[in-house]
């Protein structure tokens, strides 16, 4: 009985190490590919929708702020206007 438990635990240990190694190998290939992927996604990060001129202050009207931000009149800074979506 003890021998079968030891053998079972040894097999489970070997399977765990094998699965972990396979996962690390797969994750490693993702990390090698990610810089190229990020460069191809560059146009998304530089879209017009994300360009904010007055994100942290200096606004005078709501149109100075980014989407979903509104100009707070007391301190003249952009803050969330409470809306969702595009």
From Swiss-Prot:
Disulfide-bonded cysteines: 52-66, 59-71, 65-78
Signal peptide segment: 1-21
Propeptide: 22-50
Molecular-function GO terms, alphabetical: ion channel inhibitor activity; potassium channel regulator activity; sodium channel regulator activity; toxin activity
Entries under InterPro entries matching the protein: Huwentoxin-1
Localization terms from the record: Secreted
Chief localisation class: secreted
Modified positions (Phenylalanine amide) in chain numbering: 84
GO cellular component: extracellular region
Tissue distribution of the protein: Expressed by the venom gland.
Keywords: Amidation, Disulfide bond, Ion channel impairing toxin, Knottin, Potassium channel impairing toxin, Secreted, Signal, Toxin, Voltage-gated potassium channel impairing toxin, Voltage-gated sodium channel impairing toxin
SUPFAM superfamilies referenced in this protein's UniProt entry, alphabetically: omega toxin-like
Additional facts recorded: Negative results: does not show effect on Kv1.1/KCNA1, Kv1.2/KCNA2, Kv1.3/KCNA3, Kv1.4/KCNA4, Kv3.1/KCNC1 (all expressed in oocytes), voltage-gated sodium channels (Nav1/SCN) (from DRG neurons), and in a range of voltage-gated calcium channels (expressed in rat DRG neurons). In addition, does not show significant toxic symptoms when injected into mice and into cockroaches.
Role noted for this protein: This toxin acts as a voltage-dependent gating-modifier. It inhibits the sodium conductance (IC(50)=124 nM) and slows the fast inactivation (EC(50)=1180 nM) of Nav1.5/SCN5A. It significantly shifts the activation to more depolarized voltages and decreases the deactivation of Nav1.5 currents upon extreme depolarization, but only slightly affects voltage-dependence of steady-state inactivation. In addition, this toxin causes an approximately five-fold decrease in the rate of recovery from inactivation and an approximately 1.9-fold reduction in the closed-state inactivation rate.
Comment text on domains: The presence of a 'disulfide through disulfide knot' structurally defines this protein as a knottin.
Family: Belongs to the neurotoxin 10 (Hwtx-1) family. 28 (Jztx-11) subfamily.
Name of protein: Kappa-theraphotoxin-Cg1a 2
Organism of origin: Chilobrachys guangxiensis
